[in-house]
């Protein structure tokens, strides 16, 4: 399991699955916070939590829950 930086100790963490990989994140992590943790560019990204696409406008207020299955999809140019 990959772990995000420990800010509040192990008791203040929750386990989520991001693109099929387990990740421990701080409790109350939002989608916006998750993007920062995994270090991806925000442009051209779509995110679904538990199979439901989350609008970009909701990323700052959408708090992840323990066991959340997050899919991060990035657009790629090409042909």
Language-model regions, residue ranges each:
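Ubiquitin-like/PB1-type beta-grasp interaction modules and other compact soluble beta-rich domains
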Residues: 1-78
């Amino acid at each position: 399991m990959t772990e995000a930086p420990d800010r509040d100790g192990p008791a203040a963490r929750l386990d989520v699955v991001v693109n099929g990989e387990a990740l421990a994140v701080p409790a109350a992590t939002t989608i916006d916070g998750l993007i920062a943790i995994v270090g991806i560019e925000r442009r051209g990204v779509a995110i679904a939590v538990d199979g439901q696409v989350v609008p970009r406008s909701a990323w700052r207020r959408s708090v992840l829950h323990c066991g959340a299955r997050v899919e991060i999809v990035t657009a790629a140019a090409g042909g």
